């Protein structure tokens, strides 16, 4: 095991704070409407330009081990805030730096760090209660658009697209972000349920312009095994042919003579049929087949429940108003399932979401809910260059998270004002002793930091603005975009309550851990200078020897 350095007390904390400051100073230049960009070097490809706090934080690794530990702890603040609320990463970093900066003064002055921590916790708890009281529910699509545009660094077009997407697919719908093909961002809404499997044979195509198979008012057969023998399918095909309606077959696979027979029947016009593979794998495939069954009002034909293909009746088949099958996707529009059954299924999947342990599972389950409940909206981000596209896409994703957070917990005045109002509402808070009082006091001072940084980035005088805002009431604050004062919510400067709350909680949590640090252990740097040169051997390399007469 490598040798370790063990550093105690003030020296350890001082080095850690240096790391915190390096990271926080790099992140906080991006805060506010007049925040600047940070350019990140890439080992290959063009450098990335970003105004997203967490992207900057993730890039930073410091050479000094102790400084790096400080930086990594603050990085945790940014990434945790990003995970939970999806935005507010820069605010969280600025708050953490401010709490550490204020707190270190008290620790150095000899106050008890544990009591300081208790004071900090008490103050944060009181502030969050006030934030929740001040929170206002987000209902109109105008408010949603405002939240989106603030989070996308005052880009109104992005805010509007997100609000439109939420209108179309509802609060529960899935909204995904993809690279667009044009210069402008556009919104594409898929009504109904879409899954990523296309036709098994191009001979099923009946609409050459769209390169798709369109089925109107079709039956849907759901089977969880492979179909290779056409004899199993014949009874179903005969019944469907009599009814004169088309048929979509969703099964693990259709191969060999079964597929050939279906293709021949389709080409001859005897029966309009399309076969696709079932979406997903393993247990997820079964669950998704069940979802489709509930959506279309059919049953999954599975041997486990004693059903077989030969005995299928029309009552076992699902149906839908319309189905579009492309090369890679199938869309089921307006399935015939009962609304109550779909509702019950959505509830069931929601319970699974709450119990899910991995992010991947949770994401997949949320997709299933959206496919059952609303629909899917795709925001295609347009930009002139690859670099701009990446930067814009990151902002759209941020804005999307922020709007979701706003719908969930409501909004408060933006621009750092909500924290100052919460501070005023808390008034005088007392701890159990003088050291706890100091902890409360330092939080109350530190929560001015986001507003100070916004003003500083806009080239203003922070103290003047803070005093002016503190003299006002309610949503009165400073709009750094055009250097005016007024009602923040009317000016459209809002933050989701969840974002502000999460930023404060995470910042205080990590900052108080740093204040209560007394010892740091890191690997000793290896001394390379002596070892590097070793073993060249025989110092003199010997002459080159004469070139010999070249006989010109």
UniProtKB/Swiss-Prot annotation:
A GO CC term assigned to this protein in UniProt: cytoplasm
Pfam families, per database record: Cpn60_TCP1
GO biological process, one term: protein refolding
Enzyme Commission designation: 5.6.1.7
Signal peptide per UniProt: none
Lineage: superkingdom: Bacteria
Entry keyword set: ATP-binding, Chaperone, Cytoplasm, Isomerase, Nucleotide-binding
CDD domains named among the record's database cross-references: GroEL
Gene3D superfamilies documented for this protein: GroEL (3.50.7.10), GroEL-like equatorial domain (1.10.560.10), TCP-1-like chaperonin intermediate domain (3.30.260.10)
Reaction catalysis annotation: ATP + H2O + a folded polypeptide = ADP + phosphate + an unfolded polypeptide
InterPro entries in the record: Chaperonin_Cpn60_CS, Cpn60/GroEL, Cpn60/GroEL/TCP-1, GroEL-like_apical_dom_sf, GROEL-like_equatorial_sf, TCP-1-like_intermed_sf
GO molecular function, one term: ATP binding
Residues engaged in binding ATP: 30-33, 51, 87-91, 415, 479-481, 495
Location of the protein in the cell: Cytoplasm
Subunit composition and interactions: Forms a cylinder of 14 subunits composed of two heptameric rings stacked back-to-back. Interacts with the co-chaperonin GroES.
Family under the similarity heading: Belongs to the chaperonin (HSP60) family.
Purpose of the protein: Together with its co-chaperonin GroES, plays an essential role in assisting protein folding. The GroEL-GroES system forms a nano-cage that allows encapsulation of the non-native substrate proteins and provides a physical environment optimized to promote and accelerate protein folding.
Name of this protein: Chaperonin GroEL 1
Species this chain originates from: Albidiferax ferrireducens (strain ATCC BAA-621 / DSM 15236 / T118) (Rhodoferax ferrireducens)
């Amino acid at each position: 095991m490598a040798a370790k350095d063990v550093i105690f007390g003030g020296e350890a904390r001082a080095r850690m704070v240096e790391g915190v400051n390096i990271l926080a100073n790099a992140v906080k230049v991006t805060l506010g409407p007049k925040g600047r960009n940070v350019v990140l070097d890439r080992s290959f490809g063009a450098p990335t330009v970003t105004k997203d706090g967490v992207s900057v934080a993730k890039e930073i690794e410091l050479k000094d081990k102790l400084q790096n530990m400080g930086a990594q702890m603050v990085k945790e603040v940014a990434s945790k805030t990003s995970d939970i609320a999806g935005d507010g990463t820069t605010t969280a970093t600025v708050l953490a730096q401010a709490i550490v900066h204020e707190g270190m003064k008290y620790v150095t002055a000899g106050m008890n760090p544990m009591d300081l921590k208790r004071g900090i916790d008490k103050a944060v708890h009181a502030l969050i209660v006030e934030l929740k009281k001040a929170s206002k529910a987000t209902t109109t699509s105008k408010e949603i658009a405002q939240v989106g545009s603030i989070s996308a660094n005052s880009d109104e077009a992005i805010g509007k697209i997100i609000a439109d997407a939420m209108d179309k697919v509802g609060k529960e719908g899935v909204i995904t972000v993809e690279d667009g093909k044009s210069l402008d961002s556009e919104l594409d809404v898929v009504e109904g349920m879409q899954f990523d499997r296309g036709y098994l044979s191009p001979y099923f195509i009946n609409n050459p312009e769209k390169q798709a198979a369109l089925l109107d008012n079709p039956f849907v057969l759901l089977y969880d095994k492979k179909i290779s023998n056409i004899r199993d399918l014949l009874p179903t095909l005969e019944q469907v042919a009599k009814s004169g309606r088309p048929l979509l077959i969703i099964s693990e696979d259709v191969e060999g003579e079964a597929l050939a027979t279906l293709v021949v029947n389709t080409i001859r016009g005897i029966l309009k049929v399309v076969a696709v593979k079932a979406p997903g794998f393993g247990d997820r495939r079964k669950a998704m087949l069940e979802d489709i069954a509930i959506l279309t009002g059919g049953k999954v034909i599975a041997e486990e429940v004693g059903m077989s293909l030969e005995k299928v009746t029309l009552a076992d088949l699902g149906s839908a108003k319309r189905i579009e099958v492309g090369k890679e996707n199938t869309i089921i529009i307006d399935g015939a399932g009962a609304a109550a059954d779909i509702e019950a299924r959505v509830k069931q999947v929601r319970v699974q979401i709450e119990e899910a342990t991995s992010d991947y599972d949770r994401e997949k389950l949320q997709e299933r809910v959206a496919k059952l409940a609303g629909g899917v909206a795709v925001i295609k981000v347009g930009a002139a260059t690859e670099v701009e596209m990446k930067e814009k896409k990151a902002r759209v994703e941020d804005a999307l998270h922020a709007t979701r957070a706003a719908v969930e917990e409501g909004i408060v005045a933006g621009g750092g004002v909500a924290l100052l109002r919460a501070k005023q509402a808390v008034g005088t808070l007392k701890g159990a002793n003088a050291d706890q009082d100091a902890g409360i006091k330092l939080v109350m001072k530190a929560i001015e930091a986001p507003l100070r940084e916004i003003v500083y980035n806009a080239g203003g005088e922070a103290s003047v603005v803070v005093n002016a805002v503190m003299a006002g009431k309610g949503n009165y604050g400073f709009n750094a975009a055009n250097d005016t004062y007024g009602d923040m919510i009317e000016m459209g400067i809002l933050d989701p309550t969840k974002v502000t709350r999460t930023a404060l909680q995470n910042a205080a949590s990590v900052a108080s851990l740093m204040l209560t640090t007394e010892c740091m252990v890191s690997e000793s740097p290896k001394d390379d200078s002596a070892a590097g040169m070793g073993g060249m051997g025989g110092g003199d390399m010997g002459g080159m020897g004469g070139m010999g007469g070249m006989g010109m």
